[in-house]
Amino acid sequence: AAPVELKTNKVYPIENYGSSMAPFYSTLSIWIGGIVLVAMLKVTVSENGTTGLKHLKLHQIYLGRYLIFLILGLLQSTLICLGDLFYLGIQCKHPFLFLLAGWVSSIVYVNIIYTLTVSFGDIGKAVSVVLLVMQVAGTGGTFPIEVAPGFFKAVYPLLPFTHSMAALREAVGGLYAMDYWIDLGKLCIFLVVFLIMGLVLRKPIIKVNEAFSEKLEETKIM
């Protein structure tokens, strides 16, 4: 006879390992999709492309080109999330919220990668890859953040993956209070920051890049 009877009450249960890892790999795929876009498509408008359009301002070029990347990014994220839901058949308590989190993540990620690339060129692409590696290691995607080194614990709240995965996990396992919307709100802060960089700070950044390129050419190294 058992003197103690254990009663288990599961809270936000996840059915299988694949469903628990879906938020991480979906987030990772959306970011990689953004990197692929800037690698395949031009982020700037050529002189031939502006024929007949006079006095185009930097913010008009920035937003016009970003719209193309935004549409393609949303298509990518839709395919990824629908693939999770209907092809892989992951557990998901709130399918629409899962899709919404994927869309918001794509809007933010594509903007970050696009802004870095249009502002810094190839250096911006490299920074996007570095950010990818940092976020894979430092956002608790595969292991709890509590077991990560101190550096990653410090930057954990400052990385976009953190809030995307949290929102996607809420959609998969079930909502708790307003956490889902709070995570999406935090994610949108990155969008505001990089929009300011692309629309306001880009002009002085371009001047610095041009000066740097001229100095680099003078060295004859590259």
Please tell me what each predicted stretch does.
Residues 1, 5-222:
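Membrane-spanning alpha-helical segments of multipass transporters and channels
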